[in-house]
Curated annotation (Swiss-Prot):
This is Hemoglobin subunit beta. Pfam families: Globin. It comes from Paguma larvata (Masked palm civet). Gene3D superfamilies: Globins. PROSITE patterns: GLOBIN (PS01033). The gene is HBB. InterPro entries: Globin, Globin-like_sf, Globin/Proto, Hemoglobin_b, Hemoglobin_oxygen_transport.
Length: 146
């Protein structure tokens, strides 16, 4: 596996305290605010006219929750991310034509949100482990492009 046993422990230890629904909506919302060009994939989501509108948009929250539940699933199969995300990779790459760079951006935003929520608990070691995970997930999602 690409994570050491210690890194897995750090990742799972923190993940057990994550409110997946809340953090998912916040991460996706921030992605759309901070990197506005990502909004073009969400035109059917209604009002994305301001940061406030985005952060309170129920469709953004719902999709963010879905995204983070998939991520949660990935953490259970961290040694087979390609397999775990094969179907989602197909959907996002072949059908939706999402630029794979966006998966990396969302991963980095997720790390920011976790740091924001957990403060001192989000140590450099924990961050390093999470950066590895989000990079692995982004790469698994971009798999169909390679």
């Amino acid at each position: 596996g690409f994570l050491t046993a210690e890194e897995k422990g750090l990742v799972n230890g923190l993940w057990g305290k994550v409110n997946v629904d809340e953090v998912g909506g916040e991460a996706l919302g921030r992605l759309l605010v901070v990197y506005p060009w990502t909004q073009r994939f969400f035109q059917s989501f209604g009002d994305l006219s301001s940061a406030d509108a985005i952060m309170h948009n129920s469709k953004v929250k719902a999709h963010g929750k879905k995204v983070l539940n998939s991520f949660s699933d990935g953490l259970k199969h961290v040694d087979d991310l390609k397999g775990t995300f094969a179907k989602l990779s197909e959907l996002h790459c072949d059908k939706l034509h999402v630029d794979p760079e966006n998966f990396k951006l969302l991963g980095n935003v997720l790390v920011c949100v976790l740091a924001h929520h957990f403060g001192k608990e989000f140590t450099p070691q924990v961050q390093a482990a999470y950066q590895k995970v989000v990079a692995g997930v982004a790469s698994a999602l971009a798999h169909r492009y390679h």
